[in-house]
Amino acid sequence: MSIIDNRKAFYDYSVEERYEAGLVLEGWEVKALRAGRGQIKEGYVVIKNNELFLIGTHISPLPEASTHINPDPVRTRKLLLHSEEISKLIGKVEQRGYTLVPLNFHYKGGRVKCEIGLAKGKKQHDKRETEKKRDWEREKARLMRSPG
């Protein structure tokens, strides 16, 4: 079940491969995500010291958050993947034009996972073309549905 989807990622990038990564979260972040208080539209993944980090995602703390901690809504969060997957991703990202973007947050076995995509940025004309195709598919479906 998806918690948050990054629909903008599919508009701005053409996603070629998907990977599921674990997230290192604090307790208040998990509670806030359960309440639907997360945003990953501006998020991206960086590689530091052969580790992946999620930057730019915003998880708003609940008003009932503990008083003895100071929640940082946009802190850098570590992504957990197998070392073979990380080395494969590093090799691909070092190629020209590839980037890693968060696609969604979801639960798997009671834990929050982040689906990241290996993507290439779309040019403006590619975005327009994708939009035209989507509109035509919608129109086609509408025409097929309508009686007469």
UniProtKB/Swiss-Prot annotation:
Region ranges (Disordered) = 119-148
The compartments listed are: Cytoplasm
CDD domains, per database record: SmpB
Lineage, top-rank taxon, reads: Bacteria
Alphabetically ordered keywords of this record: Cytoplasm, RNA-binding
Any one GO molecular-function label of the UniProt entry: RNA binding
**Predominant location:** cytoplasm
The record's section on SUPFAM superfamilies has: Small protein B (SmpB)
In terms of InterPro entries, this protein maps to: SmpB, SsrA-bd_prot, SsrA-bd_prot_CS
Q: Does the keyword Mitochondrion apply?
A: no
GO cellular component entries: cytosol
- Transmembrane region positions? none
Which residue intervals are annotated with compositional bias (Basic and acidic residues) in the record? Answer: 126-142
Q: Name one GO biological process term.
A: trans-translation
Similarity comment: family membership = Belongs to the SmpB family.
Query: What NCBIfam families is this protein classified in?
Result: PRK05422.1, smpB
* Function recorded in the entry: Required for rescue of stalled ribosomes mediated by trans-translation. Binds to transfer-messenger RNA (tmRNA), required for stable association of tmRNA with ribosomes. tmRNA and SmpB together mimic tRNA shape, replacing the anticodon stem-loop with SmpB. tmRNA is encoded by the ssrA gene; the 2 termini fold to resemble tRNA(Ala) and it encodes a 'tag peptide', a short internal open reading frame. During trans-translation Ala-aminoacylated tmRNA acts like a tRNA, entering the A-site of stalled ribosomes, displacing the stalled mRNA.
The family database entries (PANTHER family) matched by this protein are listed as: SSRA-BINDING PROTEIN (PTHR30308:SF2), TMRNA-BINDING COMPONENT OF TRANS-TRANSLATION TAGGING COMPLEX (PTHR30308)
What is the designated name of this protein? SsrA-binding protein
Species the sequence originates in: Paraburkholderia xenovorans (strain LB400)
Give the gene name.
smpB
